[in-house]
């Protein structure tokens, strides 16, 4: 397994809309290795979700593990939200926008259809943190970031703060 570089805002590649994964590709050794690498990258970061777009692979899949023990890895390939209910506000962060957190309003409960790691069709109804994480990662697949939900002024403040943080690291 290998750690993958995570793209950071405002990298324009984060705005690329991902294309569907071919069902035959899902079971290939290369794709399975990529999933393993994404999980390792997510856990090391540390994070609870990682979309392929964040590691410069512009295909519609993501890995998630919202468990405290980090022992419940989930793969969502070609995810599609089929129902949304209610509304909730969560403070979100993002591995592509390190050190920044903001309140984002999302559906409280969702039902999502997707292919699992073995390429089998699944449907999951969920709420709470997992629902938020799925919606957040799916935004990445559409070239959208959680900072897009902020006002232009706040978004510019985030961009400047990240630039300042990068200067201190360099």
From Swiss-Prot:
What Gene3D superfamilies would the database entry show? Peptide deformylase
Annotated active site = 137
Q: Which cofactor does it need?
A: Fe(2+)
**InterPro entries cross-referenced by the UniProt entry:** Peptide_deformylase, Peptide_deformylase_sf
Reaction catalysis annotation: N-terminal N-formyl-L-methionyl-[peptide] + H2O = N-terminal L-methionyl-[peptide] + formate
- Report the top EC class in one word: hydrolase
Q: Which Pfam families match?
A: Pep_deformylase
Co-factor: note: Binds 1 Fe(2+) ion.
Keywords of the record, alphabetical order, are:
Hydrolase, Iron, Metal-binding, Protein biosynthesis
Q: What is this protein called?
A: Peptide deformylase 2
Name of the coding gene: def2
The record's family statement is: Belongs to the polypeptide deformylase family.
The record's section on NCBIfam families has: pept_deformyl, PRK00150.1-3
Q: Tell me a GO biological process for this protein.
A: translation
What residues does Fe cation bind to?
A: 94, 136, 140
